[in-house]
Amino acid sequence: MSRAAGMRKPGDLAGGARLAGLLVGLGLLLGGCAAPLPEADTSPAAEAAFEARTAQLEALDSWRLVARLGLASGEEYWSAQLNWRVQEGQHVLDLSGPMGRGGGRLTLSENGRALLVTRSGERFQAQDPDALVARVLGESIPVSGMVYWVRGLLHPEASYQLDVDADGRPLEIHQSGWTIEYNEFEEIDGLAMPVTMVLEREGVELRARIGRWQLGGDPS
């Protein structure tokens, strides 16, 4: 028996609503329209500018960002607020939203060990932060890569493909199976820092809009 055109099953309606909500959520996350970024520049001067920017950022042992995240995987979508603080090699990421959908804190020590504490007080530890987050959230989030990518840097232990503009700002990074696209920057203390970025891999899309950067000083 064929189904009449224009008639939908309840499941179809629910799926459509989920998809619509996902698209609206991702659209709202990126906010207004940013000015288009310039074309990629393959000149030695552009490469040197990227390396100079990298050296300046790597020299900072403390920084902080506040951002909104949106992750889409299949028909699943969640959003979260992120407060990421770094001081003397220790990363503290406070998330409101996921981790049992109640939020929690992820701490990365200088030796690479990860500790995740949910809002309900559950504690999880692992040497691999990506595997730890995937086990607790059930989603693939490349935390170890984002330590670098969120600042527009390359992970030093992975092969890569990179596009930069004439000023040395990253436009697109391909690394560890992820594509990271940068859509907007702002100047913070003389450095171009990402404002909006999109990470994609095998049907997973993670978007970030950074509302605040602090470079150096006390990030608490």
Predicted regions and their residues:
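Sec-dependent bacterial lipoprotein signal peptides
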Residues: M1-C33
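An acidic-aromatic
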Residues: Q90-S140
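Solvent-exposed helix/loop surface patches that form functional interfaces
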Residues: A131-D167
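Gly/Pro-enriched, hydrophobic low-complexity segments
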Residues: G152-S220
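A short, Trp-centered hydrophobic/proline-enriched beta-strand micro-motif
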Residues: A55-E75
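Extended lipid/amphipathic-ligand handling interfaces
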Residues: L82-R85, R105-L108, N183-E187
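Bacterial Sec signal peptide processing site at the extreme N-terminus
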Residues: G27-E51
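Solvent-exposed loop/turn segments connecting transmembrane beta-strands
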Residues: S73-Y77, P98-G103, E202-G203
